[in-house]
Amino acid sequence: MELINDFLNLTAPFFTFFGLCFFLPPFYFFKFLQSIFSTIFSENLYGKVVLITGASSGIGEQLAYEYACRGACLALTARRKNRLEEVAEIARELGSPNVVTVHADVSKPDDCRRIVDDTITHFGRLDHLVNNAGMTQISMFENIEDITRTKAVLDTNFWGSVYTTRAALPYLRQSNGKIVAMSSSAAWLTAPRMSFYNASKAALLSFFETMRIELGGDVHITIVTPGYIESELTQGKYFSGEGELIVNQDMRDVQVGPFPVASASGCAKSIVNGVCRKQRYVTEPSWFKVTYLWKVLCPELIEWGCRLLYMTGTGMSEDTALNKRIMDIPGVRSTLYPESIRTPEIKSD
């Protein structure tokens, strides 16, 4: 057994390199033809039933509007009931023929089953499940005194998607439907102070890649790995290490830094286009894909860059981080951040 592994240790890199040289050109030519075909024969969403979790703000809200513009029937769910009703009303005005709202918390298994049951009771079918609900927690790991308070991050970001997917899967099989899994580029581009958020998104990525193999062609899965998008995080809204909801745009500047923030509406349009074309992955903005190559080829460089941009000296305030100092340069914030996330009037509910 050891002899076989020793042989593979020597030969696998060599054969992989030359194998890729011959395999990649025809493979990407096939992918190119496939993309043309899928664009021409993109799915018509009119009358399709779409369930979106976390639909009260950010990408989830914009996904509701994008699906509505294409004539889909919507089941929208979130914890903030009043805000959810506002989104539903706008979706109706944009063209959705039927919208139902479900006030629920995806971190609770019973709520996830109820979300799906209410959708099926109302519409009788389910075509797309969009697992979008999520939350962000920002804190250095060593500063978290009670680790159990971080459980909510994984309960919402990871288990919420798992619970809802399990409940919806029989109906998605019947309709040969689609699942949208909202992971993040944070699954590989791991910024400090967000250890549990990063872990939840990495778990989500791995889980749905496994599900894709298990389900085969019965249910198509699109995994979304957005970069920095208009959202509550880029507005400066997050949970502390002790589970307290905080609005702090200075910390936002530290965590987002000099990375341009893309619009949530543009991101939603790219996601829906990708789902209708049966794309396996959607990354928005698309240039974030190159960060994965850097992670694979030069992981030490990524770690060094993160320490340089995000971290501070021992005992020093986060405001001294290089990210924050760059953002404090006049004109930088207005150039890189859309006006919607620069306003000081951010809701704290």
Swiss-Prot record:
Membrane topology: Single-pass type II membrane protein
Catalytic activity: an 11beta-hydroxysteroid + NADP(+) = an 11-oxosteroid + NADPH + H(+); 17beta-estradiol + NADP(+) = estrone + NADPH + H(+); corticosterone + NADP(+) = 11-dehydrocorticosterone + NADPH + H(+); cortisone + NADPH + H(+) = cortisol + NADP(+)
Induction line: By brassinosteroids (BRs). Up-regulated by LEC2.
Enzyme class: oxidoreductase
UniProt-annotated binding residues for NADP(+): 54-80, 105, 197-201
Protein keywords: Lipid biosynthesis, Lipid droplet, Lipid metabolism, Membrane, NADP, Oxidoreductase, Signal-anchor, Steroid biosynthesis, Transmembrane, Transmembrane helix
Gene Ontology terms: biological process: steroid biosynthetic process
Tissue expression pattern: Expressed in the above-ground part of seedlings, especially in the vascular tissues. Also detected in the buds and silique pedicels. Highly induced in oil-accumulating tissues of maturing seeds.
Enzyme Commission code: 1.1.1.146, 1.1.1.-
PANTHER family registered for this protein in UniProt: 11-BETA-HYDROXYSTEROID DEHYDROGENASE 1A-RELATED, RETINOL DEHYDROGENASE-RELATED
Annotated function: Catalyzes 11-beta, 17-beta-hydroxysteroid and reduces 17-beta-ketosteroids. Involved in regulating plant growth and development, probably promoting or mediating brassinosteroid effects. Plays a role during seed maturation.
Protein name in UniProt: 11-beta-hydroxysteroid dehydrogenase 1A
